[in-house]
């Protein structure tokens, strides 16, 4: 997919996205359903706990939460937001972790679902008090960042292959002249070029996730969404960089990002001077 075509898709998605701010007044997650079932409650009984959401999300969709065996890696959730005008909004989504809870003031970046007017898909949720943002699985890097990361990895593999070749060539009496001969040097450059190209293509395979992230960041007013890597602003990464002595690694910190620091970085590096 060409970059221009991808840019157009991102613009269209950003236009479809809308933002709702308010209080979390109801919440149902995969973990909630699984815990209720573990306590010998039926699925129907478990859904009754989230009855405020049943009429909007639908019992069939909520029942799938309890049937899912992926709750360890990701968590489906349904959420009710009540805005300042006391109007209720309903969303359904799936994040690696669900840390927000009832009573939190949040900002939801959502996409309308085709043929569905009762609820929308939550692309990202921001905790307004702590400036935390959560997104779907792998929705953390823009297109350029994904490509750069993959190309670096490809370059490492290419250099390792060349090093192994040189180690074997070392056993030849004329290994220096052999390695620096034009055919061998040309082969090295071709190997590195192919490694970079493969890395570029691997990075491009994440375009679907990158498109979603870039649309979200564009909606939030970022200057260069395609250059952004939210992983640099994950709580765990920030604690490691700041060398916090009392830091304890917890999984939720790997998937919770500081949107305020990301915005500050974007403004300082790519904002108008």
Indicate residue ranges for each PLM-predicted region.
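OB-fold/S1-family single-stranded nucleic acid-binding modules
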Residues: 111-154
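Short, basic/aromatic beta-hairpin or loop at an interaction surface
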Residues: 76-87
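Short beta-strand segments
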Residues: 20, 87-92
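Structural detector for short beta-strands of small beta-barrel domains
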Residues: 3-70, 105-107, 142-144
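Short nucleic-acid-contacting surface segments enriched for D/E, G, S/T with interspersed K/R
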Residues: 94-108
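Charged, low-complexity cytosol-facing tails and large interhelical loops of integral membrane proteins
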Residues: 217-273
């Amino acid at each position: 997919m060409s970059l221009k075509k991808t840019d157009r898709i991102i613009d269209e998605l950003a236009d479809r996205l809308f933002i709702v701010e308010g209080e979390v007044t109801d919440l149902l997650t995969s973990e909630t359903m699984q815990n209720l079932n573990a306590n010998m409650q039926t699925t129907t009984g478990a859904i009754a706990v989230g009855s405020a959401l049943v009429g909007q999300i639908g019992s069939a969709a909520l029942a799938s939460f309890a049937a899912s065996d992926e709750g360890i890696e990701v968590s489906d959730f349904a959420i009710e937001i009540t805005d300042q005008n006391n109007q209720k909004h309903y969303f359904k989504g799936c994040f690696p972790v669900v840390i927000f809870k009832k009573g939190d003031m949040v900002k939801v970046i959502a996409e309308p679902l085709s043929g569905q007017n009762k609820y929308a898909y939550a692309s990202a949720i921001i905790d307004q008090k702590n400036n935390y943002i959560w997104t779907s699985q792998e929705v953390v890097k823009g297109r350029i960042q994904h490509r750069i990361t993959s190309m670096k990895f490809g370059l490492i593999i290419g250099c390792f292959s060349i090093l192994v070749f040189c180690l074997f060539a070392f056993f030849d009496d004329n290994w220096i002249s052999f390695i620096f001969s034009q055919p061998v040097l040309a082969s090295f450059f071709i190997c590195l070029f192919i490694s970079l190209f493969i890395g570029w293509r691997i990075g491009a395979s994440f375009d679907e996730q990158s498109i979603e992230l870039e649309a979200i960041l564009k909606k939030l007013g970022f200057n260069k969404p395609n250059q952004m890597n939210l992983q640099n602003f994950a709580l765990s990464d920030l604690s490691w960089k700041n060398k916090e002595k009392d830091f304890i690694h917890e999984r939720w910190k790997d998937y919770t990002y500081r949107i305020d620091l990301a915005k500050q970085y974007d403004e300082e590096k790519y904002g108008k001077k």
